[in-house]
Every structure is written in C-alpha cells, then in structure tokens.
Amino acid sequence: MKLPSSIKNWVSITGAILAIFNLATILSLFILSSLFEFGGSYIGLFIYMVLPAFMIFGLLLIPIGMRLNRAQARREEAAGEVRNWPVLNFNNEGTRNAGLIFIFGTVFLLIISSIGSYEAFHYTESVEFCGKLCHKVMEPEFVTYHGSSHERVACVECHVGAGASWYVKSKLSGLYQVYSVLAHKYPTPIPTPIANLRPARETCEKCHWPEKFYHRKIKIEESFLADDLNTEQVIHLQMKTSSKMTSGGMENGIHQHINPDVRIEYKTTSDNRQVIPWVKYTNLKTGVSEVYTDNENQVSQSKLDSLENRVMDCLDCHNRPSHNYNTPQNFVDKLISAGKISKTLPGIKKVAMEVLYPEYSTKDSAFMAISEKVNAFYNSNYPDIVISRKSDIGNAVAEIQNGYASNIFPYMKASWKHYPNNIGHMEFDGCFRCHNDRHATASGKVISKDCNLCHTILAQGTPDSMQYSNAFVPLEFKHPVDIDDAWRTELCSSCHSQLY
C-alpha cells in the first residue's frame, strides 16, 4: 500500500506508534477486565477515558506531521527525489547519545507524571478536596457530614460510586461548580441535586441491602418542654425495622417499601418530593397493582401523565443520610439530654428557642445575639441565679452557639428550613407524605397513618411518672401537652415545624 511521502517524518511516526500502543493497551485491558475482573472499580476510567485520549492525540499527530512536512515533500517530488523513511543510525555517537537521553528521559517523566496523576486523582476523591477547596460554599455540607453516621464513608463513595461513567459525570458537573464558585453564580442555599444523584441501589446497597434481616430496634427519645422547669418527656419506641418471611415472601416492617417482592412507584408535583399526589403499589409475586391518589390534592390525568414515574428507593425516606440539618428543638434537646446544658437551669429550653428563631445575617451576629438574649433573660427573670450559676449560664450560651454553628449557616442560607428530613414525621411531613389517611384507591382502601404500622410505643411519660405497655398491647400515644384529639387529625409538622 503506497503512502504519501509527507508521512515519512518523525512527528507522524511518533503519533502512529502512540496510537497503536494505546489501542493495543485498551484491547488488552478490556479483555483482562471482562474475563478476569482485572483492575478494580476504576479500570473503566482508563479503558474509556485516559487511554483513548492518548490514542486520539497520537492520531492527531499523524496529519500534523504530514502538514508540517508537506511543502518539503512536494519540492522533493518535483525534483525527482525519492523521500525515504527517517533512519536512526545508532553507529553515530551523537544519535546514540540523543536516543539514550530520550528513552531514559521519557521513562523517567512517565514515572513522575504517573505518580503525580495518581496522587492528583486520589486528592480529587478525598473528603478534604470536596469539603475544603470551596470552604465557604461547601461549609454546610462539610460540617454536617462530620456530624453524621456516615462520617467514615468518603464523599465519592455515594456521590460518584464505582465505574467510569459516573466519574465522568461528576467531573463534568464539577467543572461547572468550579466556574460557579469563581464567578459567584452559585445559589444560596444550594438545592439538593435530587435529579443528578446516583440511584441508591448502586451506592447504598453496597453496605445496606433489602435481603438482609434486621432485628427490631428500641429507640428512646428524650425531649424537653419550653416551660420554666424544662419538663422532660421520655418515649420508648420499638421500631419495626425487621421483616418476616411468609409463604408470600417478605412482609411487614418499615422496609416493606424496598421489599424485593414489591415495587412502589410515585409521582410528585414538587422539586423536593414533598408533595406526592399519586402512589402505585405492585406485588411482584402476584402481579396485583393498586393505585392510590390524594383526595385532598387532586391532579388531572394529563398532569399526572407528564410527571416522572419514580420507583421508591432508600433515599425517598433516608434523604439526609450524611448532611442532616437538625432543627433547633432537636439539637437543644440533645444538648440538654447529654448534660452539656444543665436541665435545671429554669427556662433554658424556652429562651433557646426564642434566640434561635430569628434569622441572622452572619454567624458572628448570631453568636452575639445568643449571648446577649440568654444573659438578658436570666438578668430579667432570674436575677438570683445570675451569680450563683454564672458558669452554667455561660456554658449554656456556648453550647447553644455550637449547636447553631453545626446546623445553621447564614452565609449560604442553609438550615433545616430548606432541607427537610423525611425520616419520621415530627418537624416535616416525612412518612405522612403518603401515610396520611388521604391517599385512597378507587375502592376506598387507604394508606393508613396508624402509628403502629412502623413502631409501637413501649413506654412514655415523665421520668417520675412513666406508663408502660404489656407484652402484647402497645400504648396509645399521649401528647405531652393536652391538645385533646387534635394529634389524631392534624399532622405533627403542622405545629412542630415551627419553633415554640
């Protein structure tokens, strides 16, 4: 096969060698990864991204070299000269020395650049890179991550996961995020990237999987009323996190939603998935399906048809697994329960709620307001303990400030108000998005909000006046403050979403 004489140059030859070498490497790695699972999770990154980039670069060098040498090749052809391939004469001392320098220099640079690329790759995968590079912008996510149960799971394990395709998506998304930070184009607060998150079955189920059986769990909740005595309320819940195997498959329990024998689909009319007008339940064993619609939030069929049909997974309930912004009533209760704030300080829960209710423009102004208002409260209402319990008051101020700094971020306008937590149903609708006695089938079957579906109450009351259930009959919930039967008809979040 005759080739144009302009291809007989070192640039084109180098490009051809580079392209052929990388093509051979790609094919070899592809065969090894396919047959022997060689290379781990990120071998696809090199097969589909890194090596093809070098191969394309080599292919581009071929026409570049031809272009650079085309004029000289034409002159030689016009003169009747035959253009030969370049010759490396290693008998020539200068050529030999240059060749050795080139070979060893190239090997050395490849080793150094490989180490650098490897370290750079792992740095971009680190928690410090994700959380600290854009410190102010990512501070809310970084701080809440370090207070979560997934603190020892690297960001990329969930946000990227294994495989080259999601790695590419994350880096392309990251380029825009870098631009947004440099150009100050980022929104405040940053919206949760619900549409761009990797499916939970590809990340969460690496550690948590539906087929695994869990025992029921006892959850003890301690809360304090906003009264002068900080009245303590205790409730013992048995959470139905377990399942049981029946002749029809796995049934019952909170995790029925992700039962492998069941598919639950829903449609939402809100970007944050807080409003769900349509739910479909399908028993995959029998093929029987039931459609539930919200009778207080009717949506036209044409509108429903235009909405995404989403299959329920872990993140539809566990939507804040690593970045949970606790509500003030929750983090203050935890501080009092842990003894970090003395529960014998009169009215401390009440004043904490009062100082945490306003929105502050900066963290410094919030800290100053917390200190001033707490001290003013005790100076005005309890002057007799201002001196005798000065250290307790000062410690309470410091702990309220720490709770604020860990959950509320004025610069990014990030707090519980913008990031609802779907676990539970106290401050946010959570479970009650569907379990509200409003979603019903055409035959009248409803999605119940019966408390005992997900948990049973084993004990409740104040520490000195506890009420206990027997082995077979759970307790009926008793609201700490007498609100008659309003708790039966109203959603908890109707009141508890506000500070009190």
Pin down the residues of each PLM region:
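Divalent metal-coordination and catalytic microenvironments
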Residues: 58, 145, 207, 317
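Mixed-charge (acidic/basic) macromolecular-recognition segments
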Residues: 308-382
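Alpha-helical transmembrane segments and their helix-start/interface "positive-inside/aromatic belt" motifs
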Residues: 2-19, 49, 99-102
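Alpha-helical transmembrane segments of multi-pass membrane proteins
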Residues: 20-33
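Extended, compositionally biased alpha-helical segments that mediate assembly or anchoring
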Residues: 487-496
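Short cysteine-rich clusters marking metal-coordination/redox-active sites
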Residues: 130, 155, 204-207, 314, ...
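Sequence context of c-type cytochrome heme-c attachment sites
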Residues: 34-56, 62-199, 217-306, 331-340, ...
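Helix-to-catalytic-loop junction in kinase catalytic cores
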Residues: 159, 208-211, 318, 435, ...
